[in-house]
């Protein structure tokens, strides 16, 4: 099954509230909810989380889940401490799943930037 995460940058609270209310109504009606949205207040906030290295980690994990941070660091040839920081940041916004080791559950990340 194809899974998509949606990143939103610069949306006002009203947009976030409308999206949450619509999801609440659908869930209350019994519809299964499989959406993942992350909202950033600014481009700078997004850029602070989604770096080039973290994007590379997501791509790697999408195709090669890892049993641990140490195993991931070895697989990509990077320092454990830096990989740990990257995994923490990406897991915090739900782009890395830690349920059974480390994996990237989404095959697509879509971004909407408000100007």
Model-based region annotation:
Residues 28-55:
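Short alpha-helical segments that sit at the start of domains
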Residues 72, 83, 87-93:
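Basic amphipathic alpha-helical segments that dock to polyanions
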